[in-house]
């Protein structure tokens, strides 16, 4: 698997990813995307990420959408979810943006308890309504909760108590 913002993804990359059976995580924060995800010139990157998703769809690359749940995303989850559905994204992962454990300061973009609760309850209601109507969209967190509920093991390490080694290349090359 590989994680990307998709900005440099083109047909050549898509063919490579498909041929080598990569699962791609594409960072996309929907309608809130351009608030925090800027390019080197300070411009929002939402249009480019959507372009990357279309390229991957065209070439049959398997990909998931990874959304960072900021306070803005949480408060606008209905619009965010509808945007994801409209774009026919079928595999969604939501990653909560929490304050650092060693910092008492709250940042404007991090989630408070009330925002996160609203996000989870609202998203579950929207997802469940679609599920009951025969329109299944995979939301990793809910898929893992279901697995635990039926006595299976969650595949998400934060829910299973055991994580595999993951290699990361930071933005500065480390």
Predicted features along the sequence, with ranges:
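Radical SAM/AdoMet-radical enzyme domain recognition
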Residues: 1-97, 108
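Generic signal for short, ordered secondary-structure residues
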Residues: 35, 63, 102, 151-152
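A C-terminal junction/extension of Radical SAM enzymes
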Residues: 103-174
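Residue-level detector of flexible, active-site-proximal loop/helix-junction positions
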Residues: 96-99, 146
């Amino acid at each position: 698997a590989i994680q990307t913002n998709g900005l440099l993804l083109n047909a050549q990359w898509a063919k490579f990813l498909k041929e080598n059976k990569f699962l791609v995580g594409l960072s996309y924060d929907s309608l809130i995307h351009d608030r925090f995800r800027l390019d080197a010139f300070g411009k929002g990157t939402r249009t480019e990420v959507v372009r990357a998703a279309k390229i991957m769809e065209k070439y049959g690359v398997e990909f998931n959408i990874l959304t960072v749940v900021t306070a803005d995303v949480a408060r606008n989850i209905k619009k965010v979810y509808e945007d994801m559905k409209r774009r026919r994204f079928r595999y969604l992962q939501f990653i909560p943006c929490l304050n650092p454990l060693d910092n008492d300061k709250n940042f404007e973009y991090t989630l408070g308890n009330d925002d996160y609760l609203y996000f989870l309850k609202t998203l579950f209601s929207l997802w469940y309504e679609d599920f009951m109507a025969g329109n299944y969209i995979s939301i990793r967190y809910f898929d893992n909760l279901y697995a635990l509920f039926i006595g299976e093991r969650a595949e998400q390490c934060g829910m299973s108590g055991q994580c595999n080694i993951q290699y990361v290349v930071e933005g500065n090359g480390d």
